[in-house]
Amino acid sequence: MNMSSTQQEHQAAPAAAKSAEETFEPKILAFCCNWCSYAGADLAGVSRLQMPTNFLVLRSMCSARVDPEFVLRAFAKGADGVLVLGCHPADCHYIGGNYRARRRIALLKMLLEHYGLDPDRLQLEWVSASEGVKFQSTITDFIE
């Protein structure tokens, strides 16, 4: 049976789409506090913990220094998810920066929902410098 090239392309399209879905790797951006979370990321790397490779870490001096515009721009530029990682409450190098970050993230989640984006694509987590395993699990769980 002979098929035209158009028919062959039409039949191959669903297979290609299915293959693309199976190999989808979300692009994740992680803003890490310099004093805790970034050191936790470093510990995870030095400990050779297995982590996905489809995330990018950006160091920020404090989780409160992550401007909402940075998050919105990340989504506009194609990020599938954004993590903001900071010091545990009461352990912030800048006293209350993590509390400020928590308020900002709550407002940003409402804004994302207003724009029709899933607010779960943005998360705030606390990771200390000694929590390399927690950094690994946070990244892995967020990507899954």
Feature locations, PLM:
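Iron-sulfur-associated redox domains of electron-transfer enzymes in respiratory
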Residues: M1-E144
